C-alpha cells in the first residue's frame, strides 16, 4: 500500500504545503517519500512508498528517461514482465526495477487504451509534459482508493485518502470509479 497525491493548476502554494499534505498519508508508505514539481509549479505529484517490488531502486514518482513522463502508483502490476517482453517486445530499457514503470511505456505506445492491458491492483497518476495532461485511474475491481476534488480556486487534487482534502474549500469531491480513468488538460 502506498499513498499518492497530486495537485494540478496550483495557485501560490509552497513546497512545505505539499510536503505537509503528503505527510498526512505517510502511514500508507513509510519506506520512501518523493515529490515532483513541474518547473512552473502547476503540477505537483507526491508519493509515499511501501516497497514491495523494486525495493532497492523503485522510488517514486518515477520520471521517464526522457523526462517527459512522471508516474506515481499505488499498487502492483502482476503482468508487467509479460507486458514488457511480449507486448512491448523489450523496446524499452527500464530505469528502475519497479513493476509499475511499464505503465509509462504502455502509455507511450498505446495512449489511453493501455489501461485495459494492466492486470493488477492499482491507482495511479501519470503526467505527460508534452501533451500537458494528467491521467488518473483505478483498477477494474477498485481495490485501491483514489479520490479527486476541485477546489474553489479551480485546483484539482487527486489523492489516496480523503484526509488530504481537509482545509481545502471544495466545489466537488468524487471517488474515482473502479476501471475508469480521467484525463485533465491544462
What are these regions (language model features)?
Residues 1-186:
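Cysteine-centered catalytic environments shared across enzyme families
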Amino acid at each position: 500500500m502506498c499513498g499518492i497525491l497530486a495537485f494540478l493548476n496550483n495557485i501560490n502554494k509552497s513546497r512545505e504545503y505539499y510536503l505537509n499534505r503528503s505527510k498526512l498519508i505517510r502511514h500508507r508508505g513509510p519506506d520512501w517519500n518523493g515529490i515532483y514539481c513541474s518547473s512552473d509549479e502547476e503540477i505537483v505529484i507526491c508519493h509515499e512508498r511501501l516497497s514491495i517490488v523494486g525495493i532497492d531502486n523503485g522510488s517514486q514518482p518515477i520520471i521517464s528517461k526522457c523526462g517527459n513522463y512522471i508516474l506515481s502508483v499505488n499498487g502492483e502490476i502482476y503482468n508487467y514482465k509479460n507486458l514488457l517482453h511480449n507486448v512491448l517486445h523489450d523496446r524499452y530499457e527500464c530505469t528502475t526495477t519497479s513493476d509499475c514503470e511499464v505503465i509509462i511505456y504502455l502509455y507511450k505506445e498505446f495512449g489511453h487504451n493501455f489501461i485495459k492491458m494492466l492486470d493488477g491492483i492499482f491507482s495511479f497518476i501519470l503526467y505527460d509534459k508534452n501533451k500537458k495532461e494528467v491521467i488518473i485511474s483505478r483498477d477494474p475491481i477498485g481495490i485501491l482508493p483514489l479520490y479527486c476534488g476541485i477546489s474553489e480556486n479551480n485546483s484539482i487534487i487527486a489523492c489516496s485518502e480523503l484526509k488530504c482534502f481537509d482545509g481545502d474549500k471544495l466545489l466537488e469531491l468524487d471517488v474515482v470509479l473502479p476501471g475508469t480513468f480521467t484525463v485533465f488538460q491544462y
